[in-house]
Amino acid sequence: MVKKNIVVVGTQWGDEGKGKIVDLLTDRVAAVVRFQGGHNAGHTLVIDGKKTVLHLIPSGILREDVECFIGNGVVLAPEALEKEVAQLEDTGLKVKHRLKISDACPLILDYHVALDQARELARGNKAIGTTGRGIGPAYEDKVARRGLRAGDLKNMSQLKQKLQTAMEYHNYMLTNYYKAEPVDFETLWAKCQAYADLIVPMLADIPNLIDLYNKEGKNLMFEGAQGTLLDIDQGTYPYVTSSNTTAGGAASGSGIGPCQLDYVLGITKAYATRVGGGPFPTELRYDVATDEGDAVGKELGTRGREFGATTGRQRRCGWFDAVALRRSAQVNGLTGVCLTKLDVLDELEEIKVCTKYRKDGQDVFLPPSSADEYELVEPHYETLKGWNTSTVGIDSWDALPEEAKVYIRFLEKEMGVTVSILSTGPDRSETLVLEDPFEV
């Protein structure tokens, strides 16, 4: 078999079920590479009924013969890393010798978290809905060339000088602009010395490791976080994350050449969800706190257990948006789609799919680039018949209800991409592979 470099990305607003699919496919790879985002991601894996939630470490860590790389596109929170390593090793998994970290990873430090939270508070009802974990401010420091990187932990005297300079700037912003408490230098400096003990032994030249594995003919998996519609450039700006969540980010965020990427698998929920603020044309509004709103929105949220793995926040739920998926197919160059959570729709009498928007009396078949324009569109739906029977655990195409097959084929037509994998439940075993990405 010829080696394959597979990229796995979310095609919606995140929470599509990427972790399960990466874990499923990692029995065929030598390493899994995270290439963007930080510990704001929450990848939930269920294996033999046991649930594991990962925020930073690649999902391949649960397979003991798979190495895990954290690429330069990831912003690294040392405390989150330490906690996750400890939790995994408490279960008997050996983590540290299999985890390699790029020395170019920007570090998320206490002042990034303080800034993130102060900004969200200042935005009031215009809040973006960040996780408040310092992701955005850390990426800002990277682009402004004042960020501290994982490799800086190798030289503590230089690190101390860089930290003092960075903290002067950020504490000035915190105290004078946001009227918030400053971050204490001595406390953070002591933490950084402990961070070095944890991280420095795991530092590695990730682009070189990727190149060596490719030359040896080994398969690699590149694991995205969040989703395409949260991409800093292609998403519903400014209600986006601070990194490139699309397939192109796999190259810039890890150091692999783009021509080395062989297959782009887009993880796509059979309906739509979104966390936080921002446009969502197909939303079925329901508030779990008051138990008020749309009945189907409630059912999707309840059956789909739509609460964030990282924050616990209620996810907004809605019908499948094929307009948004067309954009995802374009900007990712999707080879195939993995459709997840089909079973959540099992008890619906009818299922709607948004096939186009209407704006100013015109049909719109691709999403607008700005959030302001996005808020003005109206969804146009096609209605399909539900199947009213369980699809949980179905492991063959022929065993699917006829109406479910019709729904899947309809989505394929509207997206312009073939469904290659079907997830019929949370467990690793509840998956139907229609087209093997490693065999294409």
Swiss-Prot record:
Signal sequence, start to end: none
Residues that bind Mg(2+): D15, G42
Cited function: Plays an important role in the de novo pathway of purine nucleotide biosynthesis. Catalyzes the first committed step in the biosynthesis of AMP from IMP.
GO cellular component term of the entry, any: cytoplasm
Ligand binding (IMP): D15, E16, G17, K18, N40, A41, G42, H43, T131, R145, Q226, T241, R313
Localization annotation: Cytoplasm
Residue sites binding substrate per the record: A309, T310, T311, G312, R313, Q314, R315
Broad EC category: ligase
Keywords: Cytoplasm, GTP-binding, Ligase, Magnesium, Metal-binding, Nucleotide-binding, Purine biosynthesis
Cofactor binding description: Binds 1 Mg(2+) ion per subunit.
Obligatory cofactor(s): Mg(2+)
Gene behind the chain: purA
Active site: D15 (proton acceptor), H43 (proton donor)
Binding site for GTP: 14-20, 42-44, 315, 341-343, 423-425
Family: Belongs to the adenylosuccinate synthetase family.
Organism: Hydrogenovibrio crunogenus (strain DSM 25203 / XCL-2)
Name this protein carries in UniProt: Adenylosuccinate synthetase
Reactions catalysed according to its record: IMP + L-aspartate + GTP = N(6)-(1,2-dicarboxyethyl)-AMP + GDP + phosphate + 2 H(+)
GO molecular function terms noted in the UniProt entry: adenylosuccinate synthase activity; GTP binding; magnesium ion binding
GO BP: 'de novo' AMP biosynthetic process; IMP metabolic process
Entry-linked PANTHER family: ADENYLOSUCCINATE SYNTHETASE
Superkingdom of the organism of origin: Bacteria
EC annotation from Swiss-Prot or TrEMBL: 6.3.4.4
Pathway terms, separated by semicolons: Purine metabolism; AMP biosynthesis via de novo pathway; AMP from IMP: step 1/2
Short name of any one Pfam family annotated for the protein: Adenylsucc_synt
Assembly mode: Homodimer.
Major location category of this protein: cytoplasm
